[in-house]
Amino acid sequence: MSETNERNNRHVYQGRVVSDKMDKTITVVVDTYKNHPVYKKRIKYSKKYYAHDENNEAKIGDTVRIMETRPLSHAKRYRLTKIVKKSI
């Protein structure tokens, strides 16, 4: 099986970098919406993920795309795939 086919099933998220203080690690906040079960109102919630940034290229405020990967440490389960938009 080729590498591309295998990676198509992995979770891919897009979020904003909120911390780059660790070496080769960034903290990414991913915002998403859920419908309230009773009132049917859309509720915004966010979740933080630690992602591996091999070259320390992402900075605070950047919009990035991260992909699920094998466990790299105690908390890191994602890696940086693309910087979608650089912060000013």
Swiss-Prot record:
Function of the protein: One of the primary rRNA binding proteins, it binds specifically to the 5'-end of 16S ribosomal RNA.
Claim: rRNA-binding is one of the keywords in the record: yes
Protein name: Small ribosomal subunit protein uS17
Statement: the UniProt record of this protein carries the keyword Transmembrane: no
Record gene name: rpsQ
PROSITE patterns with a match to the protein in the record: RIBOSOMAL_S17
GO MF term set: rRNA binding; structural constituent of ribosome
Subunit structure: Part of the 30S ribosomal subunit.
Species the sequence originates in: Lactobacillus gasseri (strain ATCC 33323 / DSM 20243 / BCRC 14619 / CIP 102991 / JCM 1131 / KCTC 3163 / NCIMB 11718 / NCTC 13722 / AM63)
Classification via InterPro entries: NA-bd_OB-fold (IPR012340), Ribosomal_uS17 (IPR000266), Ribosomal_uS17_bact/chlr (IPR019984), Ribosomal_uS17_CS (IPR019979)
Family: Belongs to the universal ribosomal protein uS17 family.
Keyword line: Ribonucleoprotein, Ribosomal protein, RNA-binding, rRNA-binding
Record-level GO BP terms: translation
Domain of life: Bacteria
PANTHER family, per database record: 40S RIBOSOMAL PROTEIN S11 FAMILY MEMBER, SMALL RIBOSOMAL SUBUNIT PROTEIN US17M
Pfam family, one: Ribosomal_S17
